[in-house]
Amino acid sequence: MAAPRISFSPSDILFGVLDRLFKDNATGKVLASR
């Protein structure tokens, strides 16, 4: 993981949101496939 920074750039927030969405989607697919 990257070291935490005090100031966040828009790209950091965007990647964070995308990472969360991909993880949520992956979890949803696993639960739906059961």
From Swiss-Prot:
Show the Pfam families listed in the entry. Phage_holin_T (PF11031)
Q: Which GO terms describe its biological process?
A: viral release from host cell by cytolysis
Q: Which InterPro entries match?
A: Phage_T4_GpT_holin (IPR020982)
Instruction: Provide this UniProt record's keywords sorted from A to Z.
Output: Cytolysis, Host cell lysis by virus, Viral release from host cell
Task: Identify this protein by name.
Answer: Lysis protein
